[in-house]
């Protein structure tokens, strides 16, 4: 109770002073409340007065009619939303004009230049004055005509809308006109072709029958729309897809699409009366799809239609139809259960119009989900014919939506029919077969070969006997030892058939030395690369430090390793054990908690490595840009080097940059870095959009990896470039914006959080050195020309090849450090460690890289740039050693 003594004494007051204090407090509180209420009332009165004044001002505004220019621009923005919408309107005009050849030329995704030319009926000279005015058409005279409309256009808004958001030029000629006429349009009116000319009348000129419409500087007067459509690659892809859709629906019409200045078309169909939809699908999407197409025809009035009859249904067949309540017919091309793709291809034409139907698309996807693997999609092309009286086409400004009578029942009918056909096809599987030559008996091959060998042996013995008995007979030429070739490129050693994992475990190729001799390019402060991938920070003092004690990456030495977590310095120093190696008494130290141990490696491979396909048939590429890049290296092949790489025999690795090979009687030295870079460049193009994937056990933060790369002298970063964190943040956002393209075509998987999930598997069983992963991402973001398709793909493939090549720099540096340590450490121990690591790398080069050289198309520059150098010949060696 002593603490009570320290408390201050209570102050006592009389009752009068207490009452006075209470009264004073009450008066003060009352005054404060009164003041607050007054202020609140004043504020409320001010707000009410302001709102009342605003209402009075709003009521004074008069309703007025919008000017025609404003109305036209609003309408143009609804009808022409992007270049593909403009092209769709122009394509339909060409088809309405009965054209048989349609050529489209674009630049910058149609934003800068879009031109379409046909050989249709053309535009009369008398009509050129009003052809671009709003609500002018030759296909509709009264509203009731919509009930029987057979043409695509009917509103007369397409050319008018285009002329209000671009510079429009028309060159046209009718069959009965002696010459062609050209005119320029702006805001729906004729305009002089140049400021120097005053007349805007159409000018006569030379031309062929048909119409050529040129659209330049689309959305030049609507900068907000133009800024939204900056991705010209995406716009160009939409145009390509649109052309393919119309080409399939109109197989008798020739469609040609090409970029301005490029003579090679990206889309080209021959057309002709004998051309069928299936042929067009095969030419545009590949024969692998066309072989798996099922033609499904639905006619409620004919329960057993013949799928082979009348492959081209025209819109005129719906006239005078006498069907039941579901008055429609359908013909569709559906992929079977043997085909699937990463992206769905759903194409729907109703009465010849390209439209969207989410209900029908979703319903058919549900049907296919029962037969296709998860994450894959089918190909569906549907042509639906409905009487015009049962369809409302005037629903959407872009005509992309329509309303059909009894839509739900029609969709259900189609679902049942497709499900029935797919259930039948799911019971069969298509396999490729090889046709045997006539008279070829495969079962008797072995016996016939044995008989042939026995007969040859007998004849040889007989010949030998005759030669011995007859001294005058001619002798066989003698083969000297110096001329005998004892190697064969077709023969294989026993270790080639061993599992690569077992091979490395048996040889302990992933053993680390506890003296810190390994040279790594970065360490993880938290003890694992996964921590950095999850947003952890890298140690800036250990990144790209050649003198640090980081572990050397084991990806090159271990052909099946994926991204191995890098231990921190503290973890590596915690514990070590001594392991006795092979035939010598030399010992090498390793850490029991290191990922290089057998159990840890096995665990890592189970979680991070995806075994690729053993055999591969390259997917047929349809993109013109990729075909061009492939043809470039295939047309630049050195025939002599092609034969050299097909038949050369691996001798051994001279160091981490060069390998020795034998070809015939000659010994060559080849540059592994140059040749493997070209190899992975070609393989990446051949495997375009068909890569296997190497998955990381834990996603890696791209932002952190980019910061790591910027700390490297290889990045070329300077202070004038700006802060590293801002650069890394900008480049991360850039790569995230391109993640769909990178994943679709190259299996470089990036998630929404800006983390790297996986990289492509370019060569089966081969994993690149992940030490170079930060620089790879930096180069991918900065060295690729994203705006143009061909340059974009070429740049990405170039960076992939640089990432996957046999890169000797850090391995050479490691050997240099090991050699330096020989002066202070045991020479036998150091040499043994170096031998183990080199042996694992040599296995990869011999059994993974060298077999792939047979797929290489060596360029002609390899003959002169030092990639292949002749060292000596058997004749020269025999002059020195006189023996094999």
Swiss-Prot record:
The alphabetized UniProt keywords are: Cell cycle, DNA damage, DNA repair, Nucleus
Q: A Gene Ontology MF term for this entry?
A: mismatched DNA binding
Subcellular localization is given as: Nucleus
Annotated GO CC locations: MutLalpha complex
What SUPFAM superfamilies does the annotation carry? ATPase domain of HSP90 chaperone/DNA topoisomerase II/histidine kinase, Ribosomal protein S5 domain 2-like
Q: Where is this region: Disordered?
A: 1-21, 297-318, 442-522, 544-605
Query: Which PANTHER family does this chain map to?
Result: DNA MISMATCH REPAIR PROTEIN MLH, PMS, MUTL, DNA MISMATCH REPAIR PROTEIN MLH1
What role is this protein assigned?
Heterodimerizes with pms1 to form MutL alpha, a component of the post-replicative DNA mismatch repair system (MMR). DNA repair is initiated by MutS alpha (msh2-msh6) or MutS beta (msh2-msh3) binding to a dsDNA mismatch, then MutL alpha is recruited to the heteroduplex. Assembly of the MutL-MutS-heteroduplex ternary complex in presence of rfc and pcna is sufficient to activate endonuclease activity of pms1. It introduces single-strand breaks near the mismatch and thus generates new entry points for the exonuclease exo1 to degrade the strand containing the mismatch.
UniProt protein name: DNA mismatch repair protein Mlh1
Give the source species. Dictyostelium discoideum (Social amoeba)
